[in-house]
Amino acid sequence: MQWSDQAIILGIRRHGESSVIAEVMTPGHGRHLGLVRSGRSRAMQPVLQPGNSVEVVWRARLDEHLGEFRVEPLQLRAARLIETATSVYGIQALGSLLRLLPERDPHPHLYEALAVIVDHLQDPADAGELFVRFELAVLNDLGFGLDLSRCGATGARSELVYVSPKSGRAICREAGAPYAERMLALPDFLSGQNRAADHESLAAAFRLTAYFLNRHVYEPRGVDAASARDGFVHATLKALRTASSEAPQ
């Protein structure tokens, strides 16, 4: 068995004295593991860092085997990804999200989204918005997609300011007003208003996706996967607060 594909490194773990098992995300073969011989060598260590884009060739006798990767570098981002807290926590949190999906299950749109996000992790506003949209895409692929395109009560497409915690559907201002205390806030940038994300809207968006991830994924699976995400959320919102306070009045 053999195939080749582009990939983004999600993580590695030691195997024996000189090798590693690499975890990558590919467009055609999903999240995939493979042994990299001499992966701890001076030549390979800089290549096998989370966030780097590589070309992999996977070989195994049988499809169900772990198999081996031959890895060639394409774009090495890791050096700059360790420069900011948003990027350090971000790449860890993205890997945690992708591990919610079955191994070797192709999700090409998530690979493309991942490639975009890792190039924007150092910009807190862009990284935060892209990360929230990535979480929504993962929820959708897991079968728990939110419908934010129209009001779940009236069908209206304007003044969408709430999300029902029960149905995961957007609710317009008029229909949701009597139940506002029970509703989740729908940030402007997710309601089709083409507004840029800011500290307040991102904080609301993080609460929104956290609610549905906890309800549908983490709690049913008994998974505690919040640490990297919490670190990313904290770093992103802190960076936006700092930028806002330093901006000219």
UniProtKB/Swiss-Prot annotation:
Entry annotated with the keyword Acetylation: no
InterPro entries xref list: ARFGAP/RecO, DNA_rep/recomb_RecO_N, NA-bd_OB-fold, RecO, RecO_C
Pfam families, per the entry: RecO_C (PF02565), RecO_N (PF11967)
Signal peptide residues on this chain, from the entry's feature table: none
GO cellular component annotations of the record: bacterial nucleoid
Keywords: DNA damage, DNA recombination, DNA repair
PANTHER family: DNA REPAIR PROTEIN RECO
Main function: Involved in DNA repair and RecF pathway recombination.
Record protein name field: DNA repair protein RecO
Phylogenetic lineage: Bacteria, Pseudomonadati, Pseudomonadota, Alphaproteobacteria, Hyphomicrobiales
Recorded name of the encoding gene: recO
